[in-house]
Every structure is written in C-alpha cells, then in structure tokens.
Amino acid sequence: VHTQPILGVDRPLLELAAKSAGLSAEDIVAHELITADAQRGQVIGDLLAAGRLDNLTSVWASLEAMLAAKDDAEDILVLAAFNHEEVGSASTAGAGGPLLERVLAKVAAGFGDPAEIIANSIQVSADAAHAVHPNYPGKHDPTHHPLVNKGPVLKINANQRYASNAATETEWILACRAAGVPHQTFVGNNAVPCGSTIGPISATRLGLPTVDVGVPLLSMHSARELCGVDDIDYFVRALTAFYAAAQ
C-alpha cells in the first residue's frame, strides 16, 4: 500500500526541497526524491545497526578485498555495483542492462581474445542474506539457519533464484577455509519462496560461472538493518582469499 509522505504531497514537500537548495518551488521542473534514515550507524554490542546494509555491506567488503588483493599482471579484478536490484534490475543502470558485458569486452580486447578471457573468468554475486529471526525461525528451512556473526552465507536454490552451483560453491568454501573464515549455507524453505539477486541475471548475460554469497542480516529491507560486526570482517577476508585463488 502506498502511503502519503509524512510531510504531505505536492507543494509542501517541493517547497521544503526547494528551500534546502536555495530555490523556489516554481524552479523545480521534475524531481526524484528519496527519504533516508538521518541517524548515523551505531555499533550495539556485537551488532551494527545502520541503513542500507543491504547491500552496502557487499559493496564495501568487495572494494576492501580488491584493494587487499595482490596485483597480478595475468588477471583483471572487476567490481560492478549496480542500481535498481530491488525493483528488477531492468534499467540502463541495472544488472539487466548491457553495461557490464560491454565494459568487460572492451577491457578484455586489450589483452587478447575477449571470448576466451571471459570464458576463463568467475563471478561473485555479493548480496545480503536473511539471518534467522528469533521470533520467526519457521520462515527458514529447518536444516539451514544462518546466524549473525557466524560467517558469510552461501546461497543455493534449485529454481535458479541464486546462481551458485557445485563448482562455484567449492571455490567459495575453499576460499573461506584458506582465509580461516566460518561459512554458512542458505537453502530456502519450500513453503516460503525466497527472493533473488542479480547473480542469475548477470550470469545469464555473461555466461560466467557464479556463486551467490552475502552477509547475514536481521530486519532486511527496513529503514535500519542489523548485521554482525564480525561478519563484515569475515566477508572481506573470504573475498580477498577468493580473489587470490582466482589469480
């Protein structure tokens, strides 16, 4: 159900936006306004409470891992952060668009046959995972209960909601072992359909073997989400080891 913004509609909201920009409401021709949590992130014991942990935990961890990975002239490390994942990815800035495959093809062309180079690559689809909520444990499969601060989550789905397969799962688990990082597995409850990620979309467009992984969160998609402090460090270390193994 769509509800009216707390400030009302039309003029009052536009006047507030115009005033903050030093304009008049008449100067605004069109707008894209998004509300956001104004509170700073807060560490509460062994938990981090903040907005947009889905999916900034993955973006930050991936960037840190790339910076930590050793340079290798034989390999090219790529980090792609897309928009519009929560609304289907069908946009020029989303994973359903052609941007990534075009960029990879152009970059690979400078090092040889693009098709061969891309065929020898592997992809991590990094997106937050649902940790078991203590009040609703029945929403999860009874044998797969990801917990906060117990390591990054490997996501598997027979209906291809996630792109992981036996080969890429093995690569991920070996990377976690090499990094000394605990890891968990999420398989959805058959009675509760799970969401998806851009993993299957990107894997389909690029033809790349892909593994779906992420940090477990509580209260995902709320204005303020919760994750384990240790899990962020675990995720960086696991991704760094994955990059190293791929080189």
PLM regions and their residue ranges:
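N-terminal hydrophobic/helix-forming segments and targeting peptides
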Residues: 1-247
